[in-house]
Amino acid sequence: MKNKLLMTMAVIMFCVVAAFGQRTLTILHTNDTHSCVMPLSSVLADTLQAGRGGFLRRIAMLREERAADPDLLLFDSGDFSQGSSYYTLFKGDVEVGLMNQMGYAAGTIGNHEFDFGLENMARVFSHLNFPIVCSNYVFTEYNLQHIVKPYVILKHKGLKIGVFALSPKLAGLVDQRNYGNTQYVDPVATAQKMADLLHKEKCDLVICLSHLGWEEKGMGDQEMISHTRGIDLVLGGHSHTYFQTLRYVENLDGNPIPVDQNGKSGIFIGKLTLQLDKK
């Protein structure tokens, strides 16, 4: 895929212990696409970005990937909003309409999803055809407490896949008028609570969609992972970091937990192939 204007990360394979016989699972992952509806300018000085990105290329690439593997799962780690006049003019309708064509299994909330306030966020999320998950925000307005899910369990290819999500502290990052009475809950405590719950639900794989960021001061993916156990994979975002290969962070038990992140603007889509082995 490297010869395409929309590039996909090299396939990365790693093993997770599952409750059944061996399964192969393909995961595709986007983050911080930031309303990149059209390709970036072809005259950008950065040749890695020039002419790349855009929803049509992403949709075409996904069509090819699904032709090869109809059972793949696609996730988004937030900040699909803000970054072009499409978002400014239509307040998320364009992005949501296009994402609905892509067949996401789940996505989470980035800080820019708040840019037009809670009422607009609730309106936009209610039009999505996939679940929006966030485990560490407590909503009390505009029915968001019912629209946003703390976790989802996907039954897929004979597996139970638990998905929860973490988003960043809002104070100092988002205008308070835009997040209203939304409460931020500690990501470490939330992550452990969710991992424990999903294991009690007999999930074979626990995935965290994270918009905490990589190497962020205070609370990022490294801090969260190193203080928790029971998470198998972190699909990251927020810091716009591009990983050519997976990064690993040791959890509380000293086990290396893989983390993926794919820059910004949808130039890259992460592709991971998991081999889930029998216990």
Residue ranges and their predicted role:
Residues G21-K279:
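Acidic, metal/ion-coordinating pockets
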Residues M1-T24:
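Bacterial Sec-dependent N-terminal signal peptides
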